[in-house]
Amino acid sequence: KRFQWLIIISFIVITLLGYYPTNNFPPVKQSMVVAEAHEQKAEILAASFQKPLILPHPGYLSTRFSNWHPGVDIATGLGMPIHPIIDGEITETARDFWGLGNYVVVSHENGFKSTYAHMGKVFVKTGQKVTSENLLGEVGLTGHTSGPHTHLEITHNGNYIDPLTILPKIPNMPKIASATK
C-alpha cells in the first residue's frame, strides 16, 4: 500500500514538472530548417558591422551560450588585457558583487551592445568612445566566477544573441591529459 502511494505521488510530481511521455521521434526536418534559419540570421547580423569583429582576448571557450547563460565564457590568464569586439561607446561601467563582478557595457552600431564581465580592473569611463585597439580593462576574478575568464554577452536591440554566431572562432577548452602509467 505504501509503495502504491509512492508511485502515485511520483507520477503527480512528474506531471506537475511538465514531463509527458511521448512515442514521437524528434522532427528532424523541422530541426534542420530551424538550424538553417539561425545560420542565415547569424550571417545577416555579422554583415551589419562595417569592420570585422575580434575576440576580446586570446583564450578558450569554457562555457557556451544557453537559456540559462546568456553569453560565452572565454578562459584565459589573470590580468589578460580585454579589448572591445568592435568600435563603440561605453554606456555602463559597474560592479555587481554577486553576479557579473566588475563589468563594462559597450554600445555599437545598429543596436548591438556587448558586455564584458568578471574584470579585475576597468580602464574606461561611461561616455568614452573606444576602438578595438583600446583596453577596456583586465581579466579578473570578480563576481560569481570559478576561474579567470571574460563573460561576454552580446545583445541586438535588447535581445541576447549567441556570440559564437558572429565572432571569430573560439577554440574549445583543451582536455587535460590524464596521468596514466
List each language-model region with its residue ranges.
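Surface-exposed, glycine-biased beta-strand/turn segments
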Residues: R2, F11-G101, S132
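Acidic, glycine-rich catalytic/binding loops that coordinate metals and/or anionic ligands
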Residues: R2-F11, E153-K181
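Solvent-exposed coil/turn segments that connect beta secondary-structure elements
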Residues: S66-N67, G77-G79, D87, R95-D96, ...
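Short hydrophobic beta/alpha edge segments that flank linear recognition/processing sites
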Residues: I74, N102-V106, V130-T145
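Short, conserved secondary-structure segments in the cores of folded domains
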Residues: L78-P81, G120, T126
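Zn2+-dependent peptidoglycan hydrolase active-site motif and core
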Residues: I85-F123
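Acidic, glycine-anchored pre-beta loop/turn
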Residues: V122-V130, N134, G158
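A beta-hairpin/wing motif
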Residues: G147-T150
